[in-house]
A protein has these predicted regions:
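Transmembrane beta-strands of outer-membrane beta-barrel pores
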Residues: 6-8, 15-19, 32-34, 43-47, ...
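Residues that define the transmembrane beta-barrel architecture of outer-membrane proteins
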Residues: 5-7, 20-24, 50-54, 67, ...
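Extracellular/periplasmic loop regions
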Residues: 36-122, 171-183
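Residues on the lipid-exposed face of transmembrane beta-strands in outer-membrane beta-barrel proteins
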Residues: 2-4, 26-30, 39, 56-60, ...
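C-terminal hydrophobic structural anchor segments
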Residues: 110-159
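Repeated loop/turn-to-beta-strand initiation elements of outer-membrane beta-barrel proteins
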Residues: 6-12, 34-38, 65-70, 125-130, ...
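Outer-membrane beta-barrel "beta-signal"
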Residues: 162-164, 182-199
């Protein structure tokens, strides 16, 4: 891996081997006005072909109504994902490269094209709220999320999240078809809460 600076930009170059597959990567960071744009491109040599993956994001921070706010917008392309919205069980099962990466915890999505957006609003110095949206461009389903982080007291923190999957049955976030009538594999709205004490 090579990390460097040049022309007021930061860059990384990577040559690696992962699970017997050669990988080439390049990434960079540059300032655009008062915002920051980051991007990474990875080429993976599988048994059959070179597969491309790409992520580009834009981030910006500002003060809104007296509160510190930071926002991020991101495009994610994963060449191992399934094309468009064909998430039938036989298509998923036949995608060995995708399934292997999901099982190893390298990927968490089925499709190829995604948009993401997030904001972090500092309501008070001890309370942050972050609305997030993860949108699958192939099947028009999404996951909406609101995260709350509250530093309750010295060494105490409360973390909470509300998750809302959006989309019709047969989509990634609306629920995948199982091949059985009226039975989809998905999740409904969810609520998570955690109280942590650090010592």
């Amino acid at each position: 891996k090579l990390h460097g600076f040049g022309l007021d930009r930061e860059y990384d170059l990577l040559v690696a081997e992962h699970f017997d597959e050669a990988m080439l990567g390049a990434g960079g960071v540059l300032n655009v006005g008062e915002s920051v744009v980051r991007g990474d491109l990875v080429l993976t040599d599988t048994d059959d072909e070179w597969v491309t993956s790409l992520v580009v994001n834009w981030s910006y921070s500002w003060v809104w109504g007296g509160h510190n706010v930071s926002g991020v917008a991101e495009y994610f392309f994963i060449g191992f994902g399934l094309r468009q919205d064909d998430y039938r069980p036989d298509k998923i099962a036949a995608s060995d490269e995708l399934i292997g990466r999901i099982q190893r915890g390298e990927l968490f999505t089925l499709g190829r094209h995604y948009l993401g957006a997030s904001m972090q609003v500092e309501v008070t110095p001890l309370l942050n709220v972050s609305p997030n949206l993860f949108y699958n461009l192939g099947d028009n389903s999404a996951l909406a999320q609101v995260i709350l982080q509250w530093d309750l007291a010295q060494d105490w923190q409360v973390l909470g999240a509300l998750n809302l999957p959006l989309g019709p049955p047969g989509t990634e976030y609306g629920g995948l078809e199982t091949g059985q009538d009226d039975l989809n594999l998905g999740t409904g709205p969810g609520l998570f809460a955690q109280i942590a004490f650090y010592f």
